[in-house]
Amino acid sequence: MWRLKLSEGDEESVNQHVGRQFWEYDNQFGTSEERHHINHLRSNFTLNRFSSKHSSDLLYRFQCWKEKGKGMERLPQVKVKEGEERLINEEVVNVTLRRSLRFYSILQSQDGFWPGDYGGPLFLLPALVIGLYVTEVLDGTLTAQHQIEIRRYLYNHQNKDGGWGLHVEGNSTMFCTVLSYVALRLMGEELDGGDGAMESARSWIHHHGGATFIPSWGKFWLSVLGAYEWSGNNPLPPELWLLPYSLPFHPGRMWCHCRMVYLPMSYLYGRRFVCRTNGTILSLRRELYTIPYHHIDWDTARNQCAKEDLYYPHPKIQDVLWSCLNKFGEPLLERWPLNNLRNHALQTVMQHIHYEDQNSHYICIGPVNKVLNMLCCWVESSNSEAFKSHLSRIKDYLWVAEDGMKMQGYNGSQLWDVTLAVQAILATNLVDDYGLMLKKAHNYIKNTQIRKDTSGDPGLWYRHPCKGGWGFSTGDNPWPVSDCTAEALKAALLLSQMPVNLVGEPMPEEHLVDAVNFILSLQNKNGGFASYELTRSYPELEVINPSETFGDIIIDYQYVECTSAAIQGLVLFTTLNSSYKRKEIVGSINKAVEFIEKTQLPDGSWYGSWGVCFTYATWFGIKGMLASGKTYESSLCIRKACGFLLSKQLCCGGWGESYLSCQNKVYTNLPGNKSHIVNTSWALLALIEAGQASRDPMPLHRGAKSLINSQMEDGDYPQQEILGVFNRNCMISYSAYRNIFPIWALGEYRKLMLSL
């Protein structure tokens, strides 16, 4: 049976692997009854996979209940009847909160974080399989049990039409259909395998024009595998890394995720690396295309992309650019004497890859460049220590649930979840009962702050100084994020006001100051905050976005979510410590508020770039404005934002926003006007803090009723539709949100009731 291991490992670590989570298969773990129960959970997911596409993380919950939950007394469940919203009393809310916290405490690890599923995208796992196959370590790295779960996951998320979406809830795309099909074939699936699933996938591919219509990232992976020709790719010249940094399109000016993906891609492209050909690859050349492989016009194929994948079509200028580079630039760079320049560029690129690997302890900033960097290390030296170090960190990205084994969008969301959970628990005022949860979470925050910059001179490697920041996940992944740092600072400051015997010693003042300095260093001239770094170039550069599938990837844009979080963290810090850089901090806050005001949309909302979508960003927009001292009465922006949220409340009392809002940039309800507990919580939190109770408390009562009645028998909340997003078009799962935000919203609602 699969078992989650926590904070373990022999690899190098800055904090003894605090926060690490990985699954191992243990033949001795679990009784026959427990194994039968796990199989029942799997079967139930498969049976309902088309109506409920999101797993509920039931394997981890089962393990926690087995190890910590047995014998724990359950409080009776409470419900609020229709029409009795005004009669909700403190006892009803108290019971609901205690049941929620009791359940959530079982899920917390000893090191203070809450392990969980951070999956959703469907292009990550196939890329890993291809990468391991190409490096000839697939079966040695992914055991038979791993491959069983990977097959289960891929088949569970195949759509009825035979294809796979960009994410678990998405319509079928050529990108993920081809890559998923290829991954299954590389793991030994036959042409007619999966009870017809393979044939169905092949039919989808052929019906939509064949694999020449896969977008550029897919063309790249197929070329590495040898199932597509490099001449069918648009150029990825590594020489870009040799250009002067003063140029606005230098790779070092790009958003870090973008440049860290195209960095190893340029190495493999520059080497024109191709896997050793075998019978399976030759067969794939026949299976994936509608015409014989040797008849394909690869130059035409360069710019072909299925309409299902085309979220960001190439502007004409981009096609002209790639054609010129392909026709004139590449032939010159492949011949003497300019081939010496290419060799120098390839060496430079590998130096950047090694820098990223070593400073991130071979975790890397994310799963895409993790696999690409690993492959580059193998191409450079197949028996290198760098490659071996990469292999030992693959498990950090894999998660097992009832739908199978997936590759997560990061090595987890540990720090982010902890910072939000702390604020949620504090909002309940039940600290005397659940102080141990806070103490452990406090330790996690203290243990994961980045205490030094990356090695050498970070600027030479286009890295922003990171001392004092917090990353999204663990201390071993040292890419600090603006909102993660701000939320961690806020949580640490709130905990510093609590009794030491309950929550532990506060963070040292020096560490808090480092966090403030890091936040201040990230503010752009327009007052906004981007995600990881300062915005280094111009939005117009999006014209060279080559991905087709993702939007807004070229530079690190400013976001209302990050800007609001920065305001909140800085305001709380200067409230508690008015002597440190007060003038600079106040100036920063004022500029940030101006940015939020300017980016508000005419209907009163803000567009969300990291959560779904207008509800999420509007919560942040309101929170930032209120933290700065604005009020409903004094701010037209806040009044418009509250009006927007109230206009979206559903008949059932809740709110429910579809991921299509992110994709189409138009507010869209969930199908059937269904409510969502997390959207409802965000809206309630915003309205409560903006003083809605003094104007008309009924919307709050109705929203609270929706949350109370959604709680499950064991104190958990149901997993509903996907709520995370990145790059406008790809959704990702935040499995902890279903617990954190109802607790937070009902905690604030309880405080509101006591004040009335």
From Swiss-Prot:
Functional description taken from the UniProt entry: Converts oxidosqualene to lanosterol.
Pfam families noted in UniProt: SQHop_cyclase_C, SQHop_cyclase_N
Species name for this entry?
A: Arabidopsis thaliana
Q: Where are the PFTB repeats?
A: 147-188, 512-557, 589-629, 638-679
Q: Which domain of life is it from?
A: Eukaryota
Explain the consequences of disrupting this gene.
No visible phenotype.
The entry's active site is D483 (proton donor)
Q: What is this protein called?
A: Lanosterol synthase
Q: Which NCBIfam families match?
A: squalene_cyclas
Q: Which UniProt keywords apply?
A: Isomerase, Repeat
What is the primary gene name for this protein?
A: LAS1
* Catalytic class of the enzyme: isomerase
- Reactions accelerated catalytically: (S)-2,3-epoxysqualene = lanosterol
Which terms in the GO cellular component ontology are assigned? lipid droplet
Which InterPro entries has this protein been placed in? Answer: SQ_cyclase_C, SQ_cyclase_N, Squalene_cyclase, Terpene_synthase_CS, Terpenoid_cyclase/PrenylTrfase
**What family does the entry list?**
Belongs to the terpene cyclase/mutase family.
GO biological process, alphabetically ordered? triterpenoid biosynthetic process
The free-text tissue note of the record is: Expressed in roots, stems and siliques. Low expression in rosette leaves.
Question: What's a single GO MF annotation on this record?
Answer: lanosterol synthase activity
According to its UniProt record, the EC number is 5.4.99.7
